């Protein structure tokens, strides 16, 4: 186990990519703060923080199921304080919680715009700000944003979402410079292809021939967190490219449909009209 007795906080960890990342960190030896809004089962939207926590405990690690809406500053501070009171440190923060809304500017309701901004960029900022004092005190930490390289051509059809996600990347780059001397890293990671999740299913983003499993994001995350923080920081990474550089050659194992290699779309995927 690469991260024995480290502590990780993963937002949006009740399902999908966030859950996969939380479980992978547990498998690598971490105790995990499972932070998300969902506490009760919902037939339309599977997964709760308690279900993820139980699966982590089944792996032999400790879990803290923490109900968290990242838009609530007091709740963010409370969850971080509870984790520190229980385990004394937070070594890894994964800013995965997200609001997904893809519409042209003319069709974007301002309430939706505010939601996307408050969850994605403001929520990531709040969580990052809250964990930094502990990471600096311990002279160790990795912060990971699930956000893409900034591309001014990538926002068509999803401008509000693009602004919020690019904002997360800019947070990572700024924080990297601010805390490098304290052996704390901040990086951004984005998938080369669509990833199977409730988001891709509910928003009709093609079918399983176009998707990879969340495992590829988890493998890239583990590789990033294994780096020396003060050395490997301020990076904007694509999962496949990072893993290839690290020596991975078998990407077929990440396919959702074993007979189809998903195309690389990066941040440029567009929903079909209608």
Can you describe what each PLM-predicted range is?
Residues 6, 61-62, 89-90, 135-149, ...:
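Active-site loop of short-chain dehydrogenase/reductase
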Residues 142-181, 190-195:
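Catalytic loop of short-chain dehydrogenase/reductase
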Residues 128-129, 173:
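A short, exposed helix-loop element centered on a Lys and neighboring polar residues
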Residues 28, 86-87, 103-104, 130-142, ...:
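A short helix-coil junction within the Rossmann-fold of NAD(P)-dependent oxidoreductases
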Residues 2-87, 101:
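Short-chain dehydrogenase/reductase
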Residues 181, 188-189, 205-274:
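C-terminal helical subdomain
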Residues 104-105, 112-114:
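Substrate-binding pocket helix/loop in short-chain dehydrogenase/reductase
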């Amino acid at each position: 186990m690469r991260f024995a007795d480290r502590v990780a906080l993963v937002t949006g960890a009740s399902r999908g990519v966030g859950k996969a990342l939380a479980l992978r960190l547990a498998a690598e030896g971490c105790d995990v703060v499972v932070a998300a809004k969902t506490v009760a089962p919902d037939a339309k939207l599977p997964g709760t923080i308690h279900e993820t926590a139980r699966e982590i405990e089944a792996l032999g690690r400790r879990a803290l199921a923490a109900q968290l809406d990242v838009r609530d500053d007091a709740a963010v501070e409370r969850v971080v304080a509870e984790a520190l009171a229980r385990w004394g440190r937070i070594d890894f923060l994964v800013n995965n919680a997200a609001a997904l809304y893809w519409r042209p500017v003319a069709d974007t309701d301002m309430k939706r715009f505010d939601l996307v901004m408050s969850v994605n960029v403001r929520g990531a900022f709040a969580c990052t700000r809250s964990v930094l004092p502990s990471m600096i005190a311990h002279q160790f930490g990795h912060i990971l944003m699930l956000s893409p390289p900034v591309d001014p051509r990538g926002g068509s059809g999803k401008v509000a979402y693009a602004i919020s996600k690019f904002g997360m990347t800019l947070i990572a780059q700024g924080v990297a410079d601010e805390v490098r001397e304290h052996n704390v890293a901040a990086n951004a990671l984005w998938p080369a292809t669509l990833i199977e999740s409730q988001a891709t299913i509910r928003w009709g983003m093609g079918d399983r021939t176009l998707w990879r499993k969340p495992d590829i994001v988890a493998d890239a995350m583990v590789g990033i967190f294994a780096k020396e923080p003060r050395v490997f920081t301020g990076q904007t990474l694509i999962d496949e490219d990072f893993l290839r550089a690290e020596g991975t050659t078998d990407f077929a194992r990440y396919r959702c449909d074993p007979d189809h290699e998903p195309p690389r779309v990066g941040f440029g995927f567009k929903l079909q009209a209608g």
